[in-house]
Design a protein with these regions (language model features):
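A structural motif corresponding to the C-terminal lobe/cap of the Radical SAM core domain
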Residues: 1-187, 199
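Terminal low-complexity segments of carbohydrate-biosynthetic enzymes
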Residues: 175-222
């Protein structure tokens, strides 16, 4: 807070503590996630977080739990993606032995093998939607449906702007340094550009200006 760190990224991945234990990511479930996130807000730091769908052992309803987690924590920037089995990882080696990996080029199932898996990453590929390069234990269509529902829900204009407002109220900002004239000019130009785009979009126009006015009433620090 004294150094004025403003943003941090957290790889939450999934709100299911049992699934985190299975995937050997126990550190992510050491404390209740909502309390941990809100504690960070008390130090004036906003959070962006990564969430992943497609883990082995993932249960039906994971998408709903993910939406609830994002709403309760107030995380504004939620990067929701599909699991990618990367080369030279414990996960990929296991999936190769089980004969569950899919060839990126031919989209054909690879036979069980101890060979090193090769991942061909095409230019301009969206890393959040290009996952599931293996046979999932959960129904694949269900995972895609969960993904679509999570993204469309958390980025619904009304819900998103309401979450922004809740998080803004929790952020305990302390301005110790004043921006230079160059920095102020740059931020002012960015603000004008954002306002123009938001006003142009009828779906977000009212929500944006409502939030802007309410934030202005909280003071310049917000």
């Amino acid at each position: 807070q004294r150094c004025e760190f403003r943003f941090v990224f957290m790889g939450i991945e999934t709100p299911d503590p049992d699934l985190l234990a299975v995937t050997q990511k126990k550190v992510n479930s050491m404390k209740p996630i909502v309390e941990r996130i809100h504690e960070v807000y008390k130090h004036g730091i906003a959070i962006s977080a990564g969430f992943i769908l497609g883990f082995d052992g993932e249960k039906s309803g994971t998408g709903d739990a993910m939406i609830e987690c994002i709403e309760e924590t107030g995380i504004i920037w939620s990067m929701v993606g599909l699991l990618v089995a990367l080369p030279n990882t414990q996960l990929t080696r296991r999936l190769m032995r089980e004969g569950r990996m899919i060839d990126c080029g031919t989209q054909q199932l690879l036979p069980p093998s101890d060979e090193v898996y090769r991942l061909e990453n095409l230019a301009n590929t969206d890393n959040t939607t290009s996952g599931l390069n293996f046979i999932t234990t959960r129904d694949r269509v269900e995972i895609y449906e969960d993904y679509r529902r999570v993204v469309s829900t958390v980025y619904d204009p009304a819900r998103y702007m309401a979450r922004v407002m809740r998080t803004t109220k929790m952020l305990a900002l302390q301005r110790r340094q004043k921006p230079s004239m160059a920095e102020f000019t740059k931020m002012a130009k960015a603000l004008v550009q954002i306002a123009w785009w938001m006003t142009k979009n009828p779906q977000v126009r009212w929500h944006y200006w409502s939030n802007t006015i309410r934030s202005a009433m909280m003071g310049m620090a917000k």
